[in-house]
Regions:
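C-terminal lobe and adjacent flexible extensions of AdoMet/dcAdoMet transferase-like proteins
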Residues: 204-264
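Conserved class I S-adenosyl-L-methionine
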Residues: 1-39, 52, 56, 141-173
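A short acidic, Gly/Pro-enriched loop at the edge of an enzyme's catalytic core
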Residues: 100-110
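A short SAM/SAH-binding and catalytic strip from SAM-dependent methyltransferases
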Residues: 108-123
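A short glycine-rich, Lys/Arg-flanked "PGG" loop and its adjoining helix->strand segment in the class I
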Residues: 126-138
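Class I SAM-dependent methyltransferase SAM/SAH-binding core
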Residues: 52-98
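Short alpha-helix
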Residues: 188-205, 211
Length: 264
């Protein structure tokens, strides 16, 4: 299934997903808050779904424009922003590979927290990154999320381990190419090998500031951690943010977040 119809039917679950996966959200937000210029600068959340990050950043005082391929995601984002009593500058229905309606050098920060999951070809991924770079101001910060090559294998090991022998050809395809194009409950996707990320982003003109595994050491077994509150929860966020920066653990996370600066 293509990304647009998938998310049109999945918007409430996508909003809830980051409640079930609190570590991913908390670690990603930690990196965003560390490297994004202070509010009230301007931010484009391109492919931001129902607005989890956009609404949180708006709450912090950023001027946030949310763009997404799914109209249902945008509708839910407007609803959630109203409930949170925050304002988004705009909500735009568009594809992250073509931001022709947005002016160049317009934003202090750009988030690509989903589009690169669903662009199967290298050329499309480069196009999305270059479009994000175009609308980013000089020395602006780009935050790009990826799903790792090994995430679907962890998922199947927990839920349906027989999948590996029932679909050996497809499993080999995932390992070798990272391309998910089969009719399953998830949209078509590209699962990146961790070694690809920095070369890809730097080839587009970015200076690397940080690469972090968003789940640290708790990918697919974070239920008990997610129940924590207060100091115990913050201690695990601190630990996972620290360990997520260890290159030997990049593949242990389901998601990677790249942080780069536009040079030149």
């Amino acid at each position: 299934m293509d990304a647009e119809p998938f998310y049109d039917g999945y918007a409430p679950k996508e909003w809830e997903r980051l409640e079930r996966h609190r570590t991913e959200f908390a670690v990603s937000l930690r990196a965003i808050n560390e490297f994004l210029p202070r509010p009230p600068c301007s931010v484009l959340d391109a492919g931001g779904g129902p607005g989890r990050y956009a609404i949180e950043l708006a709450r912090q005082g950023y001027r946030v424009t949310l763009l997404d391929i799914s109209r249902e995601n945008l509708r839910l984002a407007r609803q959630k922003a109203s409930e949170a009593q925050v304002s988004l500058v705009d909500t735009i229905h568009a594809n992250a590979v073509d931001l022709h309606g947005l002016g160049s050098a317009r934003y202090d920060g750009v988030l690509l927290m989903g589009p690169l999951y669903h662009l199967l070809s290298y050329e499309e991924r480069v196009q999305a990154i270059r479009e994000a770079m175009r609308v980013l101001k000089r020395s602006g910060r780009l935050f790009a999320a990826f799903i790792t090559r090994f995430a679907p294998f962890r998922y199947e090991a927990i839920g349906e381990p027989g999948w590996l022998v029932e679909h050996p050809v497809y499993a080999q395809q995932l390992l070798e190419t990272g391309i998910h194009d089969q009719p399953t409950e998830f949209a078509k996707a590209y699962y990146v090998h961790p070694s690809e990320v920095v070369p890809l982003m730097e080839s587009c003109g970015l200076r690397t500031l940080r690469l972090v595994g968003c789940e640290g050491v708790v990918a697919e077994h974070q239920e008990k951690v997610n129940e924590l509150t207060g100091a115990a929860w913050e201690a695990w966020v601190d630990l996972n943010y620290k360990l997520g920066q260890d290159p030997t653990l990049y593949g242990a996370s389901d998601h990677l977040l790249y942080v780069g600066e536009k040079s030149g």
